[in-house]
UniProtKB/Swiss-Prot annotation:
Superkingdom assignment: Bacteria
Protein species of origin: Streptococcus pneumoniae serotype 4 (strain ATCC BAA-334 / TIGR4)
Function according to Swiss-Prot or TrEMBL: Binds together with bS18 to 16S ribosomal RNA.
Pfam families: Ribosomal_S6
Signal peptide region: none
GO CC aspect terms: cytoplasm; ribonucleoprotein complex; ribosome
Sequence similarity: Belongs to the bacterial ribosomal protein bS6 family.
Protein known as: Small ribosomal subunit protein bS6
Gene: rpsF
Record carries keyword Protein transport: no
Molecular functions per Gene Ontology: small ribosomal subunit rRNA binding; structural constituent of ribosome
Protein keywords: Ribonucleoprotein, Ribosomal protein, RNA-binding, rRNA-binding
Length: 96
């Protein structure tokens, strides 16, 4: 299984319940498509290097994933691009 790290930035003005639902939804997208979520944790609110969609801060969330193929990652990528609550995301393959 290949290991991946996913980092995404959530808009800072989201309510706590909505943030938790968003994180749970995107974790389930990964698991429903065959990936295993090893760790999913929220960093704190951090200042952005530059303004994104009129926001100067964002809530950083990091997910460590193991997957046999990239189907789960492609689905995560596709859905995070169209979700207004996610400002940016990045998927990195970890060399073992």
């Amino acid at each position: 299984m290949a290991k991946y790290e996913i980092l995404y930035i959530i808009r800072p003005n989201i309510e706590e319940e909505a943030k938790n639902a968003l994180v749970a939804r995107f974790d389930s997208i990964l698991t429903d498509n065959g990936a295993t979520v090893v760790e999913s944790k929220t960093w704190e609110k951090r200042r952005l290097a530059y303004e994104i969609q009129d926001f100067r801060e964002g809530l950083y969330h990091i997910v460590n994933v193991e997957a046999n193929d990239d189907a789960a990652l492609k689905e995560f990528d596709r859905l995070s691009k169209i979700n207004a609550d996610i400002l940016r995301h990045m998927i990195v393959k970890i060399d073992a």
